[in-house]
Design a protein with these regions (language model features):
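Structural motif
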Residues: 13-17, 63-67, 88-92, 120-125, ...
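Short loop/helix-cap segments at secondary-structure boundaries that form the rim of catalytic
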Residues: 19-27, 96-101, 126-131, 141-144
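Metallocofactor- and cofactor-centric catalytic cores in central/energy metabolism, strongly enriched
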Residues: 1-21
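A short, basic/flexible loop-to-alpha-helix module at the beginning of a structural domain
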Residues: 43-58
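Glycine-rich phosphate/diphosphate-binding loop of Rossmann-like nucleotide-binding domains
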Residues: 54-115
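A glycine-rich, Thr/Ser-enriched phosphate-binding loop motif common to dinucleotide/cofactor-binding enzymes
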Residues: 29-45
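Short, well-ordered secondary-structure micro-motifs within conserved domains or adaptor modules
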Residues: 111-142
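Adenosine-phosphate binding glycine-rich loop
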Residues: 132-182
Length: 182
């Protein structure tokens, strides 16, 4: 254990590993797939729209969070040219983000509303309304029934699959664009 921590290993994959408490005292933790999932918020929202039979260019997507953080801003930038309406519900930095998106993409953002076809929550306090809602926070992200796959890689059990993809992504062996959401 000591040597593992000394040599810089900070991630372990097995979900059902029985000694997490002992390893946590040595500074080790299970793999958290949330950074990868949050970086893929826009492609996942588009996949939700496709699954519902919605044309993204005729659909509304809401982004909800307590602040205009990096992943929320990235999702907004990626979705602006791809959806009819982008709705923001962001307490801190939301107005600034709206002005930025208007300058960059010439879009007038809509107020958030319960009838959006897809919504992405970046914070547990954000509203859950919408036809399909991704919740990308906390220890268990809710992907609204989406499955994550990589062409050419045999899919494992969901609990073990996402941490594996996170490790491949963090080490540069997998790009966000390699992922498929269905």
């Amino acid at each position: 254990l000591f040597y593992i921590a000394v040599f810089g290993l900070t991630l372990l994959v097995p979900e059902d590993f029985p000694f997490w408490e002992e390893l946590s005292r040595a500074g080790l933790r299970p793999v958290d797939p949330l950074p990868l999932l949050r970086s893929c918020a826009a492609p996942m929202a588009l996949a939700l729209l496709r699954r519902q039979g919605e044309d993204p260019l005729r659909a509304a997507v809401a982004l909800r969070g307590s602040r205009a953080e990096r992943d929320l801003v990235r999702a907004a930038e990626e979705l602006c040219p791809r959806v009819r309406d982008l709705c923001l519900s962001v307490q801190t930095g939301g107005g600034e983000l709206e002005r930025y998106l208007h300058r960059q993409y010439g879009v007038a953002l809509r107020p958030d509303w319960a009838g959006v076809q897809a919504a992405i929550r970046f914070d547990p306090r954000a509203e859950e309304a919408g036809q399909a809602v991704l919740s990308l926070f906390g220890p268990e992200a809710d992907l609204a029934g989406l499955a994550v796959s990589v062409p050419g890689l045999e899919r494992q059990k969901e609990g073990q699959w996402l941490p594996l993809l996170e490790i491949l992504w963090e080490t540069g062996r997998l790009e966000r664009t390699d992922l498929e959401f269905t």
